[in-house]
């Protein structure tokens, strides 16, 4: 055995160096930490320690560490692996024969002492049970005797009292004799009762003793079984295990575990011995799962030896589920709804002839076929089911009542629409409009002698096509205003088309009839060409001659409107939840989103929950066209409502609903659908669009951030600006909205290099700071003409100039000379204009261009000159061209740039 140092020996036997040095010193062997220790010194130290502490039995300690992997089922059908490490430690003791005999003798003495103690305990218990039974029997007999004596005394007293009252003094002797006889009889009965009680007590005592003996015998048998198993356990522990390899040690440990736990009444299943890991898996996954199940199974209960019992019974038939399928669904979502793996769904689709991936979106019909093929019940769900349910859950009265007509005034710009309505309302509205033209839809209701009429005043400018179309859709009657001195104009024709598209009757108001050059007959002729036939010509359109300035014919116009409404028999339900249409909307800085709503049916009350396109909210306030607060609005009444979550789009349907939560869900659903449709329309990634972009070349863009006061103006301006786009310059609206110009708008304009345009709105303080810091182009407008003209000018500045060739001189070749430096030199006479050097030229022969190049040399009498005027001779050298002949014409021109503009 090789020598080791004290330090190494301390590490080997797992003790401190200082303690080992001290033990060597106590044994008479002085050592330091770095000194070496021989085998003789080790034996001497061991002998010293045995003398000091006594020699213990030989022991063998085995430490075992096993690792395993456990798969745990997680959420979503996924499983994760958990590493488990089990550490065990067993100590085996080898004792000498003398020690074993001594321990066996001690154990035998211990068992005998326990047996003696058990017998003494049984005898003591038996004696105690007998004494207890005797005491209970005596107490019971005593109590019964006392109770009997009391009863006898009471009976005696009663009888004596009765006898005293009935018998006379002569019968006293007989009574005393009867009493003595009765007393003797009672004493005999008492003795008989006492004897019976003693017999009962003795019987119970014997029964208790027999029961105690039986219990003691049973306990003795159980203890004997335990003692025998305990002795076997100890005898096994004292056996000698000669372990030579780690495999044998593990086998011995497992055998010992089974014997020990079998003696305790708990039979653990046999553990599957794990082999060391190698590159090839030595056992299958099923074997590993079975082994782990055997190790884990039944922690809390008693189990039989090594039986592997499956705890879950597979159902006899598949579970059929109700699968709810929307309009579109992914394969993974369908598998999740059916509680199956995605691979099974893909297999089922492949059997049906459809290839799909797990994240592929499939339509409703395909999903229905797959689900039914796999045995499930399918419930088809429409995406707008919630929207339809909310819309249908409304209280409406059944009684329809006559309502006021909704009249839209349409016509060409500056034909007097607003002035006509202004006279009817006896107000001055036109002066408030910028430039004297209407740029919003104005909604008013007026009370006449014959009833109420609601008027919608639409713009006549060409930019407000969408706004006029909305007015025609929401109306009952269209009043077409045509100036008598101007006749039918483009917007007049457009108004006729809108009225025909909406199938709305038309009443023609021939305005400005008081002007000297008014010609109503010309108006009738022009309108008849577009399908508007007067009644006097056999048509169905009423013509009324009016003057908005003088008030002529206004009453006749109102009568014609009311007559037309009576023919239409306009009715609406007045009671119940209201519905209507958004005429106009805008963002007020102090009040938030404001929407002008025309109620079609029902009654709109303050506090109602309304659903309006993508927006929803509770009506916080309602105002009429005179800016007066109102609490309710019936059919055909226009009102401004406050309280929506955002600015709705003009033309959106307004519906009163019951539940604000459902209204929010429907609004969010509509926003999502709109976003999907918007994304679907973006075709930049499509092949045909890619080729179109390749062929376009470089296209300049004018970026604009547009803010206006109302939604209709935003639509009109955006549409007009986008129509200005050409193949070379395009208008791009990078941002638009309703309300003032904010810091966000300014930041967007700075990032996209855009022009900030405000139509009837202004920038706030924070936006102005950003505009000044970034030097942005901010422009305010109140008339749409000026806005469109300036954007046109900006676009024209981005157009590349047009190149034009202008002829500046013409020379005739009279002779041809040869020059060693320039080749053929043409001797020419300037017949027109001026010949300039280094200008492009054309050589013409018989008025046909045969060459186009550059004038390289220009001389007059051997002197180089820059230009030669008309009527002078000169020599011309054409660059890279020598085929000049007499009689040719040399044409000199220059290229000039002409700035283009957008019409």
UniProtKB/Swiss-Prot annotation:
Any one Gene Ontology MF annotation carried by this entry is:
guanosine tetraphosphate binding
InterPro entries the UniProt entry points to: DNA-bd_dom_put_sf, EF-G-like_DII, EFTu-like_2, IF2_assoc_dom_bac, IF2_II, IF2_N, P-loop_NTPase, Small_GTP-bd
The protein's UniProt keywords, in alphabetical order, are:
Cytoplasm, GTP-binding, Initiation factor, Nucleotide-binding, Protein biosynthesis
Location in the cell: Cytoplasm
Q: List the disulfide bonds.
A: none
Enumerate the residue ranges of region (G2): 436-440
Chain segments carrying region G5: 547-549
| Chief location | cytoplasm
An example GO CC term for this entry is:
cytosol
Segments carrying the region annotation (G3) are 457-460
Q: Which residues bind GTP?
A: 411-418, 457-461, 511-514
Coiled-coil regions listed in the entry: none
Looking at the record's lineage, which domain of life comes first? Bacteria
State where composition is biased (Basic and acidic residues): 93-163, 174-225, 280-293
Which PANTHER family does the record match to this protein? TR-TYPE G DOMAIN-CONTAINING PROTEIN, TRANSLATION INITIATION FACTOR IF-2-RELATED
This one is known as Translation initiation factor IF-2
Originating species: Cronobacter sakazakii (strain ATCC BAA-894) (Enterobacter sakazakii)
Task: Give the taxonomic lineage as stored in the record.
Answer: Bacteria, Pseudomonadati, Pseudomonadota, Gammaproteobacteria, Enterobacterales
Gene of this entry? infB
């Amino acid at each position: 055995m090789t020598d080791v140092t004290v330090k190494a020996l301390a590490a080997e036997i797992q003790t401190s160096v200082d303690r080992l040095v001290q033990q060597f010193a106590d044994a008479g062997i002085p050592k330091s930490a770095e000194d070496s220790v021989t085998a003789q010194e080790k034996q001497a130290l061991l002998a010293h320690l045995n003398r000091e502490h006594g020699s213990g039995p030989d022991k063998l300690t085995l430490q075992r560490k096993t690792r395993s992997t456990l798969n745990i089922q997680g959420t979503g059908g996924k499983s994760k692996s958990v590493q488990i490490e089990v550490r065990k430690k067993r100590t085996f003791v080898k004792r000498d024969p003398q020690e074993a005999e001594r321990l066996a003798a001690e154990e035998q003495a211990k068992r005998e002492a326990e047996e003696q103690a058990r017998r003494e305990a049984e005898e003591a218990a038996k004696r105690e049970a007998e004494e207890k039974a005797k005491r209970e029997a005596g107490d019971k007999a005593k109590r019964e005797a006392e109770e009997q004596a009391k009863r006898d005394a009471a009976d005696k007293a009663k009888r004596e009292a009765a006898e005293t009252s009935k018998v006379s003094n002569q019968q006293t002797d007989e009574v005393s004799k009867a009493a003595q006889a009765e007393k003797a009889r009672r004493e005999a009965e008492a003795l008989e009762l006492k004897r019976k009680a003693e017999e009962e007590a003795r019987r119970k005592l014997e029964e208790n003793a027999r029961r105690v003996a039986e219990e003691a015998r049973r306990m003795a048998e159980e203890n004997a079984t335990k003692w025998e198993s305990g002795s076997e356990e100890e005898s096994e522990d004292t056996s000698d295990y000669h372990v030579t390899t780690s495999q044998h040690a593990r086998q011995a440990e497992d055998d010992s575990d089974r014997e020990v736990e079998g003696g305790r009444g708990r039979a653990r299943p046999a553990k599957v011995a794990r082999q060391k890991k190698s590159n090839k898996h030595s056992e299958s996954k099923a074997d590993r799962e079975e082994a782990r199940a055997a190790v884990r199974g039944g922690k809390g209960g008693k189990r039989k030896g090594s039986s592997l019992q499956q705890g879950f019974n597979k159902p006899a038939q598949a579970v059929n589920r109700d699968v709810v399928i929307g309009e579109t669904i992914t394969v993974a979502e369908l598998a999740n709804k059916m509680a199956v793996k995605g691979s099974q769904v893909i297999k089922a689709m492949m059997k049906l002839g459809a290839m799909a991936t797990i994240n592929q979106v499939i339509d409703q019909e395909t999903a229905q076929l797959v689900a039914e093929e796999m045995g499930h019940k399918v419930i088809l769900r429409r995406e707008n089911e919630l929207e339809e349910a909310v819309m249908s859950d409304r209280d409406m009265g059944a009684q329809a009542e006559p309502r006021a007509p909704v009249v839209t005034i349409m016509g060409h710009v500056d034909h007097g629409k607003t002035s006509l309505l202004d006279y009817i309302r006896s107000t001055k509205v036109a002066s408030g409009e910028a430039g004297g033209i209407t740029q919003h839809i104005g909604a008013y209701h007026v009370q006449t002698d014959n009833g109420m009429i609601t008027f919608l005043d639409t713009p006549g400018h060409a930019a407000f096509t969408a706004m006029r179309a909305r007015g025609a859709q929401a109306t009952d009657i269209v009043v077409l205003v045509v100036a008598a001195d101007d006749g039918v104009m483009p917007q007049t024709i457009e108004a006729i088309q809108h009225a025909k598209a909406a199938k709305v009757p038309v009443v023609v108001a021939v305005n400005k009839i008081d002007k000297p050059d008014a010609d109503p007959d010309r108006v009738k002729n022009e309108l008849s060409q577009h399908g508007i036939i007067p009644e006097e010509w056999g048509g169905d359109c009423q013509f009324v001659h009016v003057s908005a300035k003088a008030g002529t014919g206004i009453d006749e116009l109102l009568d014609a409107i009311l007559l037309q409404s009576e023919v239409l028999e306009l009715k609406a339900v007045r009671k119940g939840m209201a519905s209507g249409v958004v005429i106009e909307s805008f963002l007020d800085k102090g009040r938030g989103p404001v929407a002008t709503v025309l109620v079609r049916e029902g009654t709109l009350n303050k506090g109602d929950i309304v659903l309006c396109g993508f927006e929803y909210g509770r009506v916080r306030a309602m105002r009429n066209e005179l800016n007066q607060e109102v609490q309710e609005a019936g059919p055909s009444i226009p009102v401004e409502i406050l309280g929506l979550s955002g600015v709705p789009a003009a033309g959106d349907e307004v519906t009163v609903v019951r539940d604000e939560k459902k209204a929010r869900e429907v609004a969010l659903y509509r926003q999502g659908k709109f976003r999907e449709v918007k994304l679907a329309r973006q075709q930049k990634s499509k092949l045909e669009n890619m080729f179109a972009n390749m062929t376009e070349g470089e296209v300049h863009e004018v970026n604009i951030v547009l803010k206006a006061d109302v939604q209709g103006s935003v639509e009109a301006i955006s549409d007009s600006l986008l129509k200005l786009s050409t193949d070379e310059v395009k208008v791009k609206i990078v941002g638009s909205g309703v309300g003032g110009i904010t810091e966000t708008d300014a930041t967007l304009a700075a990032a996209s290099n855009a022009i900030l345009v405000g139509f009837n709105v202004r920038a706030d303080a924070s936006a102005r700071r950003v505009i000044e810091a970034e030097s942005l182009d901010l422009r305010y407008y109140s008339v749409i003409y000026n806005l469109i003209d300036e954007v046109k000018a900006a676009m024209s500045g981005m157009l590349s100039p047009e190149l034009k060739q202008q002829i500046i001189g013409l020379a005739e070749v009279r002779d041809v000379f040869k020059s060693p430096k320039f080749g053929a030199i043409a001797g020419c006479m300037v017949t027109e204009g001026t010949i300039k050097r280094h200008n492009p030229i054309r050589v013409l022969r018989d008025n046909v261009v045969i060459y186009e190049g550059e004038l390289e040399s220009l001389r007059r009498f051997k002197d180089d000159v820059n230009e030669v005027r008309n009527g002078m001779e000169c020599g011309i050298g054409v660059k890279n061209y020598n085929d000049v002949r007499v009689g040719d014409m040399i044409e000199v021109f220059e290229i000039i740039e002409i700035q283009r503009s957008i019409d």
